[in-house]
Regions:
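Boundary at the C-terminal end of the N-terminal hydrophobic targeting segment
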Residues: 18-24
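Bacterial N-terminal signal peptides that target proteins for export
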Residues: 1-8
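Aromatic sugar-binding surface patches on proteins
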Residues: 103-116, 122
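Short flexible loop/turn segments that cap and initiate beta-strands
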Residues: 55, 59, 68-97
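Short beta-strand elements
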Residues: 138-163
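Bacterial N-terminal signal peptides
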Residues: 8-17
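Beta-strand-rich domain onsets/edges
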Residues: 24-62, 66-68, 155-163
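Internal, hydrophobic beta-strand segments that form the core of beta-sheet-rich folds
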Residues: 113, 120-146
Length: 163
């Protein structure tokens, strides 16, 4: 009778210890806020910096990304080694931390990057993900909804130019 009770206590202790380790690892979980907007291209008509998910070839997609720690505090370039957008075609585009708008007095700070869609890029949905790497080299990935209508989509046509 003593043996099953002792064994049960050992198993319970081991389980609680494992739960504490898991909680400690989860304590490093990051949270993401991100969107896509049309990035300003010289000669092209706006509007720019407005939400979009459909882009024509030669237009520029801009990602605006916030990475938050477990306490909800924003993580800048002193707390993260890198933030990278990885496209399903294999391209990896690094983000930069900074104030926005980039000219003038910043009203917000976040990670951002842009990608100009090549003139010969195929049309259709393009899957992407955001990978944040902390100073210890640990990574965490965020992916947007997997519904095709909400994905980044390259559509046929030419960008509208300024008159």
């Amino acid at each position: 009778m003593r043996r099953p009770i002792t064994l049960s206590i050992l198993i319970l202790s081991a389980s609680l210890g494992a739960a504490q380790v898991a909680d400690a690892q989860d304590g490093k979980r990051l949270f993401f806020e991100a969107d896509m907007v049309r990035h300003a291209q010289e000669g092209q008509a706006g509007p720019f910096c407005v939400l979009a998910n459909q882009f024509k070839r030669k237009e520029a997609v801009a990602w605006r990304i916030r990475v938050l720690d477990q306490a909800g505090q924003q993580m800048d370039d002193k707390k993260l080694k890198s933030v990278v957008v990885e496209l399903s075609d294999g391209q990896k585009i690094p983000a930069k931390w900074g104030g926005h708008p980039p000219r003038g007095t910043p009203t917000d700070f976040f990670w951002s990057l842009h990608w100009i869609i090549p003139a010969d890029y195929p049309t259709g949905s393009l899957v992407y993900k955001v990978v944040a790497t902390d100073l210890d080299g640990r990574t965490q990935t965020w992916e947007p909804f997997k519904r095709e209508p909400t994905q980044l989509t390259v559509i046929a046509g030419e960008p509208t130019m300024k008159q």
